[in-house]
Amino acid sequence: MKTLIVDDEPLARNELHYLLNEISGFNVIDEAENIEETLEKLLSETYDLVFLDINLMDESGIDLAQKIKKMKQPPHIIFATAHDTFAVKAFELDAIDYILKPFELERIEQAVNKVKHQISNSNEIDHITSEPSTLSMQQDDRQENEDQTVLPIEMNERIYVIRKDDITAVSVNNGITTINTTHRTYQTNEPLNYYEKKLSNNTFIKIHRATIINKTHIDSVEHWFNYTYQVTMTSGDKFQVSRSFMKAFKHEIGLA
């Protein structure tokens, strides 16, 4: 289960992280300390569960939960806070549970089990309602994405249809996804992983957890800080290749 802990207090994050490591079933536990970092992670990664504090430095956890709820595939939310005054509002937002600080392992485990139960039930329903040829359907979906030459983008209550070949890069910053093309720029609230699926062919490569580029639109590559690269696109936009994506990037453009 992939989980994100959102709390502006490092000690609280560390304590909850430690307790979750005592419970089986967590393969990834990430952390965020503010709204901007949280939205960036949620738009670039898919999480099963978010532990969310109420009082964050820059915004209310309740307000953040309302934004999360509007996502196409929102993660489950467990509020983890020192205040009990927002419990009713939390459950109005379909929170799985509401746990109070100081944290106790037994209480955390009880809340986590509720999430596991919901995920299990959801998977069973998906299995029952799916066709027998699920694998072939997934293959067909991938093939459809590769065959589809255009991509619809919704912005300002209008839907723009753009050619995939014209897309130079897709990136996330401050919770906003930007699609750069050869002739203009679009902004949307769709998460980065949505475009990863839509642009799943050999032309588009991920160079950062928040950036996808079209390698056919690379103009130049230069050495950058900490043994990384900076990529300049034909549009003039510049993007940094993060160290974790360096090996794959070099292979994709023939430097390996």
From Swiss-Prot:
CDD domains: REC_LytTR_AlgR-like. It is found in: Cytoplasm. Keywords: Cytoplasm, DNA-binding, Phosphoprotein, Transcription, Transcription regulation, Two-component regulatory system. The modification 4-aspartylphosphate is found at residue 53. It comes from the Bacteria. It holds the Pfam family LytTR. Member of the two-component regulatory system LytR/LytS that probably regulates genes involved in cell wall metabolism. This is Sensory transduction protein LytR.
